Amino acid sequence: MQGEIIAGFLAPHPPHLVYGENPPQNEPRSQGGWEVLRWAYERARERLDAMKPDVLLVHSPHWITSVGHHFLGVPELSGKSVDPIFPNVFRYDFSLNVDVELAEACAEEGRKAGLVTKMMRNPKFRVDYGTITTLHLIRPQWDIPVVGISANNSPYYLNTKEGMSEMDVLGKATREAIRKTGRKAVLLASNTLSHWHFHEEPTIPEDMSKEYPATMAGYQWDIRMIELMRQGKTSEVFKLLPQFIDEAFAEVKSGAFTWMHAAMQYPELAAELFGYGTVIGTGNAVMEWDLRKAGLSMLGAADQKQRSAAVA
């Protein structure tokens, strides 16, 4: 078997997008809203459907672990996921299957690379809303096994450079695990871009007349970074990433974006933008890096050349 990273998606997780869609799993009902971003995810779903992956790997900033990088390690998980900040829009009944073999391989490769890793074995674990939201938005059928990865808090309690270095190692370990297990995988970076946001909610949450960028600076940073990604200027994106994080309060600080690109070996590959929009003022872009189309997806036995990124 030859492993393959088919594609990577920037797949943000505003629960409002699920709320606006009114799926049967989500208890609150809406009048719609955030259509541009939901349409963007419709395009991403079509792309994913054509890829036929074995597994979806998602790194979420809302499964926060202070000690080490944790992986879902229970074959089946179900329950109700509730957004603690927006329980009025997201109370979601989930049921998912976990690729435990691949998760264990990721943990082992991370451990061998010097990271602290741990398998989450609690059968009653309530999966965080970031993981659930991203997975629903990209694959509402819930018919593809997943690997859920926590966001180790090192970028915050150490510093951005040290934290991103850990995420770089984690991404490379993930790549090696996919190679050794022969999986055909899609990576999901569950991150918004600029994360400045409003502090008061409209009476009707889906009132789109109240939805716009929280700050001009955050919006301008988002557009600058999106343009670089669309042009395939990955090295420049990562050179600017620390400044972007500081000035736009960007959620990519939590590590998913770096993890994904490290696993993909930081390709200088133009990303496709499916859509950009705001949710409570934060900047959200749904984007795809199609490695299979570019001839960069296969992970052969000789795949040992790991390009160092700007985080090195």
From Swiss-Prot:
User: Which pathway does the UniProt entry assign to this protein?
Assistant: Xenobiotic degradation; nitrobenzene degradation; Xenobiotic degradation; 4-chloronitrobenzene degradation
Instruction: Cite the Gene3D superfamilies for this sequence.
Output: LigB-like (3.40.830.10)
- Record's keyword annotation contains Plastid: no
What does the UniProt entry list as the effect of changing H62A?
Answer: Loss of enzyme activity
Cofactor or coenzyme needed: Fe(2+)
Q: Which domain of life is it from?
A: Bacteria
Reactions accelerated catalytically: 2-aminophenol + O2 = 2-aminomuconate 6-semialdehyde; 2-amino-5-chlorophenol + O2 = 2-amino-5-chloromuconate 6-semialdehyde
Q: Which SUPFAM superfamilies match?
A: LigB-like (SSF53213)
Q: How is the cofactor bound?
A: Binds 2 Fe(2+) ions per APD complex. The iron ions are bound to the beta subunit.
What general EC class does the enzyme of this chain belong to? oxidoreductase
Q: Which GO terms describe its biological process?
A: catabolic process
Where along this sequence does the record place binding of Fe cation? H13, H62, E251
> What are the EC numbers?
1.13.11.74, 1.13.11.76
Gene Ontology terms, MF aspect: ferrous iron binding; oxidoreductase activity, acting on single donors with incorporation of molecular oxygen, incorporation of two atoms of oxygen
The alphabetized UniProt keywords are: Aromatic hydrocarbons catabolism, Dioxygenase, Iron, Metal-binding, Oxidoreductase, Plasmid
- Which InterPro entries does this chain map to? 2A5CPDO_B (IPR034943), Xdiol_dOase_suB (IPR004183)
Mechanisms controlling activity: Complete loss of activity in the presence of Ni(2+), Co(2+), Cd(2+), Zn(2+) and hydrogen peroxide, however activity with hydrogen peroxide partially restored upon addition of excess ascorbate. Partially inhibited by Fe(2+), Mg(2+), Ca(2+), Mn(2+), Cu(2+) and also by EDTA, at 2 mM concentration. Total activity inhibited in the presence of catechol or 4-nitrocatechol but completely restored after removal of catechol and addition of 2 mM Fe(2+) and 5 mM ascorbate.
Query: Looking at the keywords, is tRNA processing present?
Result: no
User: Extra info from the record?
Assistant: Not active on 4-methylcatechol, 4-chlorocatechol, 2,4-dihydroxybenzoate, o-nitrophenol, p-nitrophenol or 4-nitrocatechol.
Provide the assembly information.
Answer: The APD complex is a heterotetramer of 2 alpha (CnbCa) and 2 beta (CnbCb) subunits.
Homology family: Belongs to the LigB/MhpB extradiol dioxygenase family.
| Role played | Component of the 2-aminophenol 1,6-dioxygenase (APD) complex that catalyzes the ring fission of 2-aminophenol to produce 2-aminomuconic semialdehyde. CnbCb seems to be the catalytic subunit of the complex. Also active on other substrates such as 2-amino-5-chlorophenol (68% activity), protocatechuate (33% activity) and catechol (5% activity).
Name assigned to this protein? 2-aminophenol 1,6-dioxygenase subunit beta
Q: Which organism is it from?
A: Comamonas testosteroni
Q: Which gene encodes it?
A: cnbCb
